[in-house]
């Protein structure tokens, strides 16, 4: 790979990192071609972009964006790495868990950047999968706002029924 090709890849990765709210780093080494194709199709169906990139190019892209990536320098940026880009924080984590349920251990979660916070290690995958999306949070707020009104309506209906029985 020439320096020009590397510079283009660094620029692409930097743009994707800057444009996405979330990126995950995975290890897909040892996956068969069929497994990689199935994983890419699943990513595409969920709106997640998956790209295999050399660790040195990932580091240079992060440096270009002035992002302190020291938390990722350990296990996250060692070995083969694939990047997953998403605007929803929990979708890549849920996608990885769903793919693993099919009996495939790879790709392994190595680390993630969610809204500029770094999460490194396999033990963080469950926590990332449990993060609620914007739509889920809005649904929870609407349900909380509707609950008092439903209680008032229920109370009024009950009182009118009691009043009708007495009359």
UniProtKB/Swiss-Prot annotation:
One of its GO terms (cellular component) is large ribosomal subunit. InterPro entries: Ribosomal_uL10, Ribosomal_uL10-like_sf, Ribosomal_uL10_bac, Ribosomal_uL10_bac_type, Ribosomal_uL10_CS_bac. It comes from the Bacteria. GO terms for biological process: translation. Keywords: Ribonucleoprotein, Ribosomal protein, RNA-binding, rRNA-binding. The keyword Cytoplasm does not apply. CDD domains: Ribosomal_L10 (cd05797). GO terms for molecular function: large ribosomal subunit rRNA binding; structural constituent of ribosome. The keyword Ribosomal protein applies. SUPFAM superfamilies: Ribosomal protein L10-like. Forms part of the ribosomal stalk, playing a central role in the interaction of the ribosome with GTP-bound translation factors. Belongs to the universal ribosomal protein uL10 family. HAMAP family: Ribosomal_uL10. PANTHER family: 39S RIBOSOMAL PROTEIN L10, MITOCHONDRIAL (PTHR11560). Part of the ribosomal stalk of the 50S ribosomal subunit. The N-terminus interacts with L11 and the large rRNA to form the base of the stalk. The C-terminus forms an elongated spine to which L12 dimers bind in a sequential fashion forming a multimeric L10(L12)X complex. This is Large ribosomal subunit protein uL10. It comes from Cytophaga hutchinsonii (strain ATCC 33406 / DSM 1761 / CIP 103989 / NBRC 15051 / NCIMB 9469 / D465). The lineage of its organism: Bacteria, Pseudomonadati, Bacteroidota, Cytophagia, Cytophagales.
